[in-house]
Curated annotation (Swiss-Prot):
Species this protein is from: Clogmia albipunctata (Mothmidge)
Record has Nuclease as a keyword: no
Region (Disordered): 1-77, 229-270, 318-361, 398-422
Localization of this protein: Nucleus
GO process terms (BP): regulation of transcription by RNA polymerase II; segmentation
Keywords associated with the record: Developmental protein, DNA-binding, Gap protein, Metal-binding, Nucleus, Repeat, Zinc, Zinc-finger
Name of protein: Protein hunchback
Source organism superkingdom: Eukaryota
Polar residues bias (residue ranges): 16-37, 257-270, 345-358
Repeat in keyword set: yes
């Protein structure tokens, strides 16, 4: 091909006509071949012709396009760092130094029915938008222009990348060295090459953004996690957490009111069990609240596990409550208002037996009647009033009530000692258990965070940084000692 040719007046007029035609939009037909709105019939080129530069009669392509084609396609280039520019194949390990050899190699990876060809050069692709951007380069159409300089490009992505050259903020930095760059892809290459760790990502204004995470071994461009913003431009994370806290506190306040209205003694273990579904309800009410950036759990599964645990424990609780109701029916006397009753009334008449009640706490042991006998001055039967120590000894030795939990191997009796003593109940076990590490969690949030570190394909591969561990011990030490941004 010739590099530069002598121009004639006829050729100048033909070039003006060509530029006018190139300004018209390009449409594609069913065969994905571009057609110009001109008087000449468009034709598709054979595959053999694609390997050679396009040579026409001068009315379609001028000498400048031929020279540009030689420079861009056939000649290797040197980048800004003084190294030869290479083109790497994403499907294999092939590396080319010219566009022409790279396009010829891509033919083996693209199916014939999906291959899109350019009529003006050997360019091929399987994506329509790539062909559209390529044709814009041929036409000289670059609608995206920089407002700070004369730079123009064919798509928005290239403009966004160019705008970083006008900024002095290096958003992406290395945690283990002084490496800093403006581009996420460059940081990923650095981290993979030297096995370094990524720190916190900066915003465009230089402020730290803990919500954006670098997926070192991922193929997707940019940070992995994005958060929606409200009208004011603030992240919805804090508002969702506050909303969940308010809803959770509202549910906690509703349980004591329910107990007071029903006057049903509830064991402390049932209060803890009643709080189990709150976590799943919080995430159902606030679906946009992110729990862990590496995990997308189905919280309906957690709710189903909680309901299954409650269904197994509920028969034991119902039996305990039925036994309490039967004991209350055996007592003919009704309890008075707790506000008016004292702890123990020793001045009552023999005909009016007094009952033992609690002002702040409900009765936890079996209900029974205390008969107080007053000594009579008229007879000599020797009846004496029971001492307070005897009454207290009877209160301290009721028949213990056992609540069997299906998740524990042994049963723990509920022993009542006094009003201020707390009832010890063995906590629920194995509700949230990691089968990979053989670790149990009492709280669903801790269990969810832990499971987020397990990989999808390899359970002992860290989902945060990509490090692969040998066994459960090495994996646990890794997530406990190594910092994850």
């Amino acid at each position: 091909t010739s590099s530069t040719a002598r121009k004639t007046p006829e050729k100048d007029s033909l070039k003006q006509d060509q530029n006018q035609l190139l300004k018209t939009p390009i449409q594609t037909n069913g065969n994905q071949q571009s057609t110009f709105d001109s008087g000449e019939d468009s034709h598709s080129m054979p595959d053999s012709d694609l390997l050679e530069p396009v040579i026409t009669d001068g009315a379609d392509v001028d000498d400048e396009n031929d020279a540009e084609e030689d420079d861009d396609i056939r000649t290797p280039k040197i980048n800004s760092h003084g190294k030869m520019k290479t083109y790497k194949c994403k499907q294999c390990d092939f590396i080319a130094v010219t566009k022409l050899s790279f396009w010829e190699h891509n033919r083996i990876h693209i199916k014939p029915e999906k291959m899109l060809k350019c009529q003006k050069c050997p360019f091929i692709t399987e994506y329509k938008h790539h062909l559209e951007y390529h044709l814009r380069n041929h036409n000289g159409s670059k609608p995206f222009q920089c407002k700070q300089c004369n730079y123009s490009c064919v798509n928005k992505s290239m403009l966004n990348s160019h705008m970083k050259s006008h900024s002095n903020i290096y958003q992406y930095r290395c945690k283990d060295c002084n490496y800093a760059t403006k581009y996420c892809h460059s940081l990923k290459l650095h981290l993979r090459k030297y096995s370094h760790n990524p720190p916190m990502v900066l915003n465009y204004d230089g402020t730290p953004n803990p919500l954006r995470i670098i997926d070192v071994y991922g193929t997707r461009r940019g940070p992995k996690v994005k958060f929606h913003k409200d009208e004011g431009g603030h992240n919805l994370l804090n508002s969702n957490i506050n909303t969940s806290r308010r809803s959770k506190s509202g549910k906690r306040d509703s349980f004591p009111n329910f107990e007071q209205s029903q006057h049903v003694p509830t064991p402390p273990s049932s209060q803890a069990l009643a709080m189990l579904p709150n976590l799943a309800n919080i995430f159902q009410q606030s679906p946009s609240m992110p729990l862990f950036p590496y995990l997308n759990l189905n919280f309906h599964h957690i709710l189903a596990q909680q309901k299954a645990a409650l269904s197994q424990i509920s028969p034991s609780i119902n039996g305990w409550q039925n036994e309490e109701n039967c004991n209350e029916e055996e007592t003919p006397e009704k309890e008075e208002d707790p506000k008016r009753m004292s702890a123990l009334d020793l001045s009552s008449n023999p005909s009016t037996p007094s009952t033992v009640s609690q002002v702040k706490h409900k009765r936890k042991g079996r209900a029974f009647k205390l008969e107080l006998m007053k000594e009579s001055s008229d007879d000599d039967e020797g009846q004496t009033i029971r001492t307070l120590g005897e009454i207290r000894s009877e209160l301290e030795t009721p028949k213990p009530v056992q609540l069997q939990l299906p998740t524990s191997s042994t049963t723990t009796p509920l022993k009542t000692t006094s009003e201020d003593d707390s009832t010890s109940v063995e906590p629920l076990q194995n509700l949230y258990e990691c089968k990979f590490c053989d670790i149990s969690f009492k709280h669903a949030v801790l269990y969810t965070i832990h499971m987020g570190y397990h990989g999808y394909n390899d359970v002992f591969k860290c989902n945060a940084c990509g490090k692969k561990c040998e066994d459960r011990v090495a994996f646990f030490l890794h997530i406990a000692r190594d910092a994850h941004a």
